[in-house]
């Protein structure tokens, strides 16, 4: 929480006091500056006064203009300068949510007063939320443009299913920020800039990727299972997967439900009795017979030992299970040299 030298609520009170009664009421209602921090819509304010939404908007805009022209506004220049310096420290461009939460996370009324000071203050420029970015404010057009363009490039270079540690994403981000002043290249500022993007996101394990990806936008048990197995780094029993989901994400995961989700999702491959791995690790899907077929299809005729060696890299099974499957003459044939091939 930031400690401000001025008191935002007192500052706003002085600024709105220069307005006529109706203008003051419109501003207080519109920005949630009264006892109730709820903000009223143009329509609700219009209904209260029996005027149109457009008329309310005109009164709001005129009131802001009058405040900016007032002696009270001039007198509060040090307050606006303090906010501007805080913006500079936080990175020059920051999401509205992050900035207000930096001031306070508990006092909604105080947040509303700070927000109003950003609206009337001349150094601050708002960029509305769109498909790419959140609501954000900045104090430097050129910097804002560079940061947003760098975030676009960062997103374009991410594969849909890619996950990166935060340190690696920041390193990649810096590659696109070479023209930005060194003073901004601090980790906490770079993280704030990353949070501006709606296209890039962070999963519950702190790994970054494309925001709409299942690996980042985690919904159901199968998505949590994917992250749990990926974190484990090697094949794991479905019962342990359920335990890992509960431990890592504080989510209830019934063993049977978890097992069913692992069976249904192509991201997972059964590699032994109850043991699951990720398909992206290169494990072949299917029963042992299918794995032998895929191995022979890729490598051609192989000796019994070579087949066992290659299948055991894909499956946690007994050697005898592989040998039994090789006796299936419908699928496999043995030549004079003792090598096996597809029938």
Residue ranges and their predicted role:
Residues 1-343:
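C-terminal non-catalytic scaffold/interaction domains in large multidomain proteins
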């Amino acid at each position: 929480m930031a400690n401000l030298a001025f008191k935002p609520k007192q500052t706003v009170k002085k600024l709105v006091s220069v307005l006529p009664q109706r203008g003051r009421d419109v501003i207080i209602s519109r920005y949630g500056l009264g006892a109730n921090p709820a903000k009223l819509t143009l329509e609700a304010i219009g209904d209260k006064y029996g005027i149109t939404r457009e008329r309310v908007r005109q009164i709001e805009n005129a009131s802001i203009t009058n405040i900016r022209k007032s002696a009270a506004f001039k007198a509060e220049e040090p307050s606006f300068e303090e906010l501007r310096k805080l913006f500079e420290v936080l990175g020059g461009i920051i999401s509205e949510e992050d900035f207000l939460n930096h001031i306070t996370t508990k006092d909604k009324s105080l947040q509303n007063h700070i927000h109003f000071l950003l609206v009337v203050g001349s150094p601050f420029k708002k960029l509305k939320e769109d498909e790419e970015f959140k609501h954000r404010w900045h104090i430097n057009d050129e910097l804002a443009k560079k940061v947003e363009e760098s975030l676009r490039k960062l997103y374009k270079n991410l594969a849909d299913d890619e996950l990166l540690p935060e340190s690696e994403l920041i390193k990649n981000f810096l590659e696109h920020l070479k023209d930005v002043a060194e003073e901004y290249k601090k980790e906490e500022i770079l993280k704030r800039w990353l949070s501006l993007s709606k296209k890039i996101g962070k999963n519950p394990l702190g790994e970054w990727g494309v925001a709409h990806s299942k690996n980042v936008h985690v919904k159901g048990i199968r998505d949590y299972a994917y992250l749990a197995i990926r974190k484990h780094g090697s094949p794991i029993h479905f019962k342990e997967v359920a335990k890992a989901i509960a431990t890592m994400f504080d989510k209830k995961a019934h063993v049977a439900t978890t097992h069913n989700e692992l069976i249904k999702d192509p991201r997972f491959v059964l590699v032994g009795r109850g043991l699951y791995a990720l398909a992206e690790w290169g494990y072949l899907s299917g029963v042992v017979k299918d794995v032998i077929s895929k191995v022979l299809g890729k490598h051609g005729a192989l000796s019994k030992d070579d087949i066992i060696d290659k299948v055991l890299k894909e499956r946690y099974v007994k050697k005898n299970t592989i040998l039994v499957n090789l006796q299936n003459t419908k699928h496999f044939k043995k030549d004079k040299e003792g090598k096996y091939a597809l029938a």
